C-alpha cells in the first residue's frame, strides 16, 4: 500500500540466496541483483523512466493493469520474459513505477528471497532466456515503446534505459575483445616481445578506462555489501570476472537460439 500510494506499480528488491556465501556461480546473481535493485531501478523510478518488474515481490494498481488489458490475459504466453515486458508496457502506457526499499521491525530488508542456479550450465541456460528475451525477442515484440505525450527529456531517458537493458550482446563482444587482448599481451611479454610505447592519447584512454573499472567495482561492492555484509561486498569484486564469462557464454547461446527461432524453431523455455 505504501508503494502504490504515489505510483501505479511497486517492486521490492529480490535478494538471491546461495548455499555458501563464497559460491562463485550462485553468488554472482546476488552481486548483479544488488546493483540492479539498489542502484539502477531506484534511479529509473526517480527519473520516471521505464522500469521492469522482477516477476516476484511486485504489486500493481488495478486501473494501471486495465490500461494495458488486451483481452488475452496479463502475460503473453509466447514471451520469454513476461515479467520484464509487463513493466515496460505499463511504463509505455503512462504508468509510474517505484522501487520500495524498507526494513521490517527486525531490521531486515523487506525483500523477496530465493535460491538461484549454482552450476555453470544451469546459470548459462537461465540467463540465455533473459538475454534473448530482453535484447532480441523483446526488441522484436515491443520495439522502443515510450509514453505518448511525455516530455522529450522523459522519452529520451526511457529510450536510453531500454538501450541499457538490451546492450548485453554488445557488452559481451567488448568483454571478449578485452580479455583476448589481455591474454595476447601477457603471452607476447612472456615470449620476450618488447613493451610498446603507447601514444599519449591511447595511454590516457587506458588510464581512464582503468579508473572507470575501479569505480564500477567499488559501486558493485557497495551495493552487494548492503545486501550481504562486508564479506559479500568484497566477494562481489572477485566474482566480477565470473559474471563477465557467463555473459559471454550466454550471448553466444542467445544469438544461436534466436537465429534458430527466426528459421522456424518454436519458442520454448529452456
Predicted regions mapped to residue ranges:
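Long helical/loop segments within the catalytic core of UDP-sugar-dependent glycosyltransferases
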Residues: 2-79, 91, 120, 124, ...
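Active-site-adjacent bridging/hinge elements
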Residues: 34-37, 59-69, 102, 145-152, ...
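Short active-site alpha-helical segment characteristic of glycosyltransferases
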Residues: 82, 86
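Catalytic donor-sugar/metal-binding loop of nucleotide-sugar-dependent glycosyltransferases
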Residues: 87-107
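Active-site donor/metal-binding and catalytic loop motifs
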Residues: 100-120
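Long, K/E/R/D-enriched contiguous segments that form extended
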Residues: 113-194
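Membrane-proximal soluble regions of multi-pass membrane proteins
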Residues: 126, 130-142, 147, 235-270
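Membrane-embedded multi-pass helical conduit in multi-pass membrane proteins
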Residues: 164-260
Amino acid at each position: 500500500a505504501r508503494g502504490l500510494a504515489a505510483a501505479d506499480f511497486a517492486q521490492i528488491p529480490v535478494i538471491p540466496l546461495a548455499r555458501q556465501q563464497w559460491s562463485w556461480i550462485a553468488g554472482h546473481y546476488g552481486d548483479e541483483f544488488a546493483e540492479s535493485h539498489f542502484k539502477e531501478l531506484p534511479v529509473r523510478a526517480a527519473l520516471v523512466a521505464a522500469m521492469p518488474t522482477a516477476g516476484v515481490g511486485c504489486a500493481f494498481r488495478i486501473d494501471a493493469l486495465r490500461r494495458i488489458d488486451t483481452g488475452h490475459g496479463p502475460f503473453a504466453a509466447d514471451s520469454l520474459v513476461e515479467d520484464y515486458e509487463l513493466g515496460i508496457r505499463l511504463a509505455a502506457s503512462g504508468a509510474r513505477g517505484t522501487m520500495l526499499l524498507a526494513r521490517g521491525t527486525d531490521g531486515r530488508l523487506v525483500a523477496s528471497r530465493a535460491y538461484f542456479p549454482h552450476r555453470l550450465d544451469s546459470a548459462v541456460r537461465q540467463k540465455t532466456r533473459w538475454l534473448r528475451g530482453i535484447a532480441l525477442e523483446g526488441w522484436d515484440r515491443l520495439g522502443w515503446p515510450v509514453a505518448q505525450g511525455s516530455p522529450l527529456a522523459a522519452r529520451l531517458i526511457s529510450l536510453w534505459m531500454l538501450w541499457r537493458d538490451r546492450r548485453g550482446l554488445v557488452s559481451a563482444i567488448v568483454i571478449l575483445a578485452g580479455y583476448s587482448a589481455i591474454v595476447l599481451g601477457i603471452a607476447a611479454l612472456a615470449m620476450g616481445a618488447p613493451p610498446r610505447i603507447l601514444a599519449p592519447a591511447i595511454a590516457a584512454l587506458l588510464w581512464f578506462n582503468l579508473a572507470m573499472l575501479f569505480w564500477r567495482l567499488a559501486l558493485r561492492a557497495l551495493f552487494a555489501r548492503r545486501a550481504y555484509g562486508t564479506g559479500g561486498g568484497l566477494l562481489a569484486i572477485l566474482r566480477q570476472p565470473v559474471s563477465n564469462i557467463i555473459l559471454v557464454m550466454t550471448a553466444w547461446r542467445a544469438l544461436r537460439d534466436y537465429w534458430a527461432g527466426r528459421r522456424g524453431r518454436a519458442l520454448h523455455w529452456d
